[in-house]
Amino acid sequence: MDVCSWKEMEVALVNFDNSDEIHEEPGYATDFDPTSSKGRPGSSPFSNWRVLISDNTNHETAFSKIPGEYVDPPGPEPVVLNEGNQRVIINIAGLRFETQLRTLNQFPETLLGDREKRMQFFDSMRNEYFFDRNRPSFDGILYYYQSGGKIRRPANVPIDVFADEISFYELGSEAMDQFREDEGFIKDPETLLPTNDFHRQFWLLFEYPESSSAARGVAVVSVLVVVISITIFCLETLPEFREDRELKVVRDPSINTNKTGLSQTMFTDPFFMVESTCIVWFTFELVLRFVVCPSKTDFFKNIMNIIDIISIIPYFATLITELVQETEPSAQQNMSLAILRIIRLVRVFRIFKLSRHSKGLQILGQTLKASMRELGLLIFFLFIGVILFSSAVYFAEVDEPESHFSSIPDGFWWAVVTMTTVGYGDMCPTTPGGKIVGTLCAIAGVLTIALPVPVIVSNFNYFYHRETENEEKPNIPGELDKILNSMGSRMGSTESLNKTNGSCSAEKSRK
């Protein structure tokens, strides 16, 4: 049978096929030559079948449906001169995807990028790779290779299913971390725990109130001590409780020297006794946490620990000052008392110790930290406005004899009060020009403050909703948690993902 007869048979067969179901079959490089050595088409039927199913044929024929064992010789993955441009077929549970080999070779450590790994799934009879996996998920997997490492979950694929596909195709920990971040999994800093079991128990007891009932009890005691300390700090300034603790200078005529004495014995003062009890607890807590902490360097980098240190310094500074000032001259005593008052003022920072046990204060701190740029812009705008309007009101009021603005620095306070819309009224312009400047100052202040406020509020809402969602929403399905946890161990990672209500925390397992 000659070539013309075979082509007539092809036309006849194509006419019987449904044209709607015809798909173009991709061509593959092969060492098979459909022509004879003399350049003429071969006369064997198999050579004609090869011509009919080659990529020069635009329509599928009945011969293209012949099983591969009658057409393609079985063997390993086809090799061509330009392997980078070679097209490969990936069959995902019957859905075929076509891409170039160089696209897959971008990531040689993955399942599809490693030749040895993907050859385990090569079907030599059909000349394609076959994976009995989730079909819609492979859109995102193939996009990872095409985009150079960007992972995107298709909208119609559940999170746990796509996470399992990332694990199966061995895309790596970076792809999994990117997927977690895109899906709203907030990765918290890694939690370090002491290696010693005894130290770990005390560290959890004082550092993590939610770890046990005993830890919650310690947290309650710590909060009560802080509240008592702040209460004592405020009550001792009341007139009915305040005693003159400054030293009285008593002149002794016989020796013509100054002798000093305390208005009352400091060690019998009830406020001092209560304060000492609070300081004992603060010191014990601080020293114990320092001894059992897993990293001494990180301990001093923690702002909460710095606040704890600052909160107990005034007590010991006051105690030392009171004990040594009896031998000092009167002038040095006055200086010591001035320093002592400043040191005592630092005690007010103990209120920040409550943030260790208050989610609200932690959210506020996170908001301020995230909004530092906006707060800096706000202060910068206020600074410009203060300089501008204090100068303007000075020159507007300079000819007024009863003006409150004797200089530009005197107008700083008025500009700040006016721009913040407080308006104490202690200083105000009296001339028409000064009132116009005051009006513009108030309007500029409203606009200046209003501009960065929405960004700060947005940051607060973000941290607030993230925290409330962690407490109110139910846990995610255990299947997803299992997949994500197994992903870390499969990739050789020591991190495990605990996602609760839209957030995740990385905990390092230590021996």
Swiss-Prot record:
SUPFAM superfamilies: POZ domain, Voltage-gated potassium channels
Sequence motif Selectivity filter, location on chain: 421-426
Primary location recorded for the protein, binned into one broad class: membrane
Single GO MF annotation: voltage-gated potassium channel activity
InterPro entries reported for this sequence: BTB/POZ_dom, Ion_trans_dom, K_chnl_volt-dep_Kv, K_chnl_volt-dep_Kv1, SKP1/BTB/POZ_sf, T1-type_BTB, VG_K_chnl, Volt_channel_dom_sf
Tissue specificity: Expressed strongly in the inner ear and weakly in skeletal muscle. Not detected in other tissues.
Superkingdom per UniProt: Eukaryota
Role according to the record: Voltage-gated potassium ion channel that mediates K(+) permeability of excitable membranes. When opened in response to the voltage difference across the membrane, KCNA10 channel selectively allows the flow of potassium ions across the membrane down their electrochemical gradient.
Similarity comment text for this entry: Belongs to the potassium channel family. A (Shaker) (TC 1.A.1.2) subfamily. Kv1.8/KCNA10 sub-subfamily.
Domain commentary: The N-terminus may be important in determining the rate of inactivation of the channel while the tail may play a role in modulation of channel activity and/or targeting of the channel to specific subcellular compartments. The segment S4 is probably the voltage-sensor and is characterized by a series of positively charged amino acids at every third position.
Name recorded for this polypeptide: Potassium voltage-gated channel subfamily A member 10
Chain's gene name: Kcna10
